[in-house]
């Protein structure tokens, strides 16, 4: 294994120290470790907080700033942050209007964020939750009960962050997050595995002519391993799966801060249909050249046009990675005029930055 690290035990500490030094708009906290906006708490606005295992950079710490997250809790590589990190971060960013926890659907994340939610409620913080489960590839996986939360998380953090920035209430922000989760669809493929520093070897092996179809962002198995032929064929198979697997029913939990208890809600993922308008994210899983990602986007635009989908906005690049995995994911999020206005609203973070 050759990686630009000193000691595997210091990877998280050193990368966070570098992030904070590179971006004075962020504050790195210690004991426990978490990151916030330097101006947190922001009075009069809902605070957004997310987190998860490291290795997916720039998610989540790269999305802290005006118009997006108030703070983020990074765990060790592919390891959920502990409840005390989440609790302390939320206490730091709470500006009095409540805290919304955006949680990717992985067993460890769910358990730890739910524990922190109850601790926050007991401490008098108005808090609620949104669970993201946009991966259409598999229902259950190595890390999840239910579908995985992947790159649509980035889009939701941007859009809900814009709503919080303009002064929307905690309930409105949470409702928007759940709506966007039901309108977003993602799928990924891998041509090569990632290497976790502590393991020192690739997490799986593929033959030269194989790809992992429906891979997760921790290298979890997907739908199957199948022959890799060409860019167009790969995008076509992914696009068809997004459409075919795009509708499903499931039960998701959220915290009702008024009743002080968990509530279960039946939700339906909305399939993409002709006439829909979308934001398209072509996401580098770590080691895929940008030139290839633009090739992917070229084919994706053709398939969207054929299916009657209009791409209103796009992101192409590394936004939700899996260390050094060779591969990419596609996310399509159904939008309307209001959603696009939130997308176009100013955002100033290390990884997304536009507007005044």
From Swiss-Prot:
Alphabetical UniProt keywords: Glycerol metabolism, Kinase, Transferase
Pathway: Polyol metabolism; glycerol degradation
Record entry for activity regulation: Inhibited by chloro-3-hydroxyacetone and D,L-glyceraldehyde.
Enzymatic class: transferase
Catalytic residues identified in the record: 56 (proton acceptor), 218 (tele-hemiaminal-histidine intermediate)
NCBIfam families the record matches: dhaK1 (TIGR02363)
Entry protein name: PEP-dependent dihydroxyacetone kinase, dihydroxyacetone-binding subunit DhaK
Organism in which the protein naturally occurs: Escherichia coli (strain K12)
Lineage: Bacteria, Pseudomonadati, Pseudomonadota, Gammaproteobacteria, Enterobacterales
